[in-house]
Amino acid sequence: METPPVNTIGEKDTSQPQQEWEKNLRENLDSVIQIRQQPRDPPTETLELEVSPDPASQILEHTQGAEKLVAELEGDSHKSHGSTSQMPEALQASDLWYCPDGSFVKKIVIRGHGLDKPKLGSCCRVLALGFPFGSGPPEGWTELTMGVGPWREETWGELIEKCLESMCQGEEAELQLPGHSGPPVRLTLASFTQGRDSWELETSEKEALAREERARGTELFRAGNPEGAARCYGRALRLLLTLPPPGPPERTVLHANLAACQLLLGQPQLAAQSCDRVLEREPGHLKALYRRGVAQAALGNLEKATADLKKVLAIDPKNRAAQEELGKVVIQGKNQDAGLAQGLRKMFG
């Protein structure tokens, strides 16, 4: 994220007229990249739960719906929970931040100071107002520790944590949420203690934190939240990737589980890459072969999909999920051939 210029807390930004802000907003919208891949039917198998040699350090990033959120921000910003006298008279495009997973758009109301942001272990003093959920954060100022504590299990926990990761000390921001027509949520970060980067942690600490993230990811996946699960698996992988090679065998499981999430989220390219990392360490990993086959079919690479699915059936001939997926691939191939033949007849007939 581009860091805005450092201002004193509470200082208003009047560097541009409203017309220039609106122009920059439209230009900023044009730069938003949306992932529009259509998800296939979800795999009929389960996550990898046992330990075996695997993550993609990339966490699925899609910003579908960002344009709609920004339009709502533009129209609803006057409904904020604070006094309008605290609002900057003019904002720049750099004052908008799009959460990579598309869960919200942040508009900076009051810029913070410094360059540091909360990280693992940081104790943050925050004030949150206007959450639409039935049970939001506690009223008044609250202290939350990044990456630790039961607050992360709450409906609002993941959203606040993602936003805090992008904030500087003293920053106040409005969050526009998909499907939320009311006033924007407002979040203020008064202060935070210095946490630790992953390279500062002991090996045992990294492994323990990674196990917690993996367990949380599996809970979210089973609850029907592949996006949240992928975020947990990605965090666990980033912790383990800092360990000396070859790394713990849990990496293979995490990559395989991340691939399952990416398939459900309509990201077959990322899913195939996650499976590649599994198969580099364990060429006969059935679930990785199956998921890569599904991903290749979604990408239209039918020969590669067929090869992976046949490998699964060679190892496990009774694997029903692979049998069904291979049948779909065969039908898809016949339809492609029929379409090509029809096109050639029209061209040369």
From Swiss-Prot:
UniProt repeat feature TPR, residue ranges: 210-243, 252-285, 286-319
GO cellular-component term (any): extracellular region
Alphabetical list of Pfam families matching this protein: TPR_1, TPR_16
PTM sites of type Phosphothreonine: 3
Tissue: Ubiquitously expressed with higher levels in testis.
Keywords recorded for this protein, A-Z: Phosphoprotein, Repeat, TPR repeat
GO biological processes: regulation of blood vessel branching; response to radiation
Superkingdom, natural source: Eukaryota
Chain intervals for the UniProt region annotation (Disordered): 36-55
Assembly: Forms a ternary complex with CDKN1A/p21 and HSP90AB1/Hsp90.
Function in brief: May be involved in response to X-ray. Regulates p21 protein stability by binding to Hsp90 and p21.
Protein name: FK506-binding protein-like
Gene: FKBPL
